[in-house]
């Protein structure tokens, strides 16, 4: 049925039950309004602040830290390569302040960080088992890991596994162990 039903009493007038398009009269040059136009415009939504879940923000922060960690590891690797070009014992004795094996342990750890991005306590314990016969090598390994833990920015340590954050907190203990080592070797 059409909108303008014609009644029998007056074919020129619309039925009162028919709905007119709008409350206003239609004027020449005006567009005919459809029923959709006639209804109220949809309620405008208030602009809402963009809500980012805490988990998403945390992931983005971790990604940013991972990028910075990769950069720090590259810098450490470059620094280690400048310390490593020793082929003769005379060159090694020049850099005895840090110790050749300490630097070699640091190079190994930095390579592992670059490749797997993790230094775990299980890896450290395996390395300690290998160096267990030599007290000096064990101390050098611990010193190397402690130095590495202090070279990497603290807010990125959590991304490196569980070894370096635990060593970072034990800084005073490490200094005490180094002093004891020096006093026993003298």
UniProtKB/Swiss-Prot annotation:
Coiled coil: none annotated. Disulfide bonds: none annotated. Residues 1-12 have a biased composition (Polar residues). One of its GO terms (cellular component) is host cell nucleus. It is found in: Host nucleus; Host cytoplasmic vesicle. Its main location: host cell. The keyword tRNA processing does not apply. Residues 1-43 are annotated as: Disordered. Keywords: Host cytoplasmic vesicle, Host nucleus. InterPro entries: Paramyxovir_NSC (IPR003875). Ribonucleocapsid-associated protein that interacts with the phosphoprotein (P), thereby increasing replication accuracy and processivity of the polymerase complex. Belongs to the morbillivirus protein C family. Interacts with the phosphoprotein (via C-terminus); this interaction allows C to associate with the ribonucleocapsid. This is Protein C. The lineage of its organism: Viruses, Riboviria, Orthornavirae, Negarnaviricota, Haploviricotina.
């Amino acid at each position: 049925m059409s909108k303008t039903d014609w009644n029998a009493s007056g074919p020129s007038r619309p039925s009162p039950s028919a709905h007119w398009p709008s409350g206003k009269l239609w004027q020449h040059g005006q567009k005919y309004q459809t029923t959709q136009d006639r209804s109220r415009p949809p309620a405008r939504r208030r602009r809402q602040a963009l809500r980012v879940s805490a988990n998403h923000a945390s992931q983005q922060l971790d990604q940013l830290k991972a990028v910075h960690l990769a950069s720090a590891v590259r810098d450490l690797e470059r620094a280690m390569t400048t310390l490593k070009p020793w082929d003769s014992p005379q060159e090694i004795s020049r850099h005895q302040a840090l110790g050749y094996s300490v630097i070699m342990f640091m190079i190994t750890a930095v390579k592992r960080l670059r490749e797997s991005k993790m230094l775990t306590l299980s890896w450290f314990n395996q390395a300690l088992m290998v160096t267990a016969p030599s007290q000096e090598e064990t101390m050098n390994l611990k010193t190397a890991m402690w130095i590495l833990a202090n070279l990497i920015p603290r807010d990125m340590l959590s991304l490196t596994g569980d070894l370096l954050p635990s060593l970072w907190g034990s800084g005073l203990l490490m200094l005490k162990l180094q002093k004891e080592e020096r006093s026993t070797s003298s």
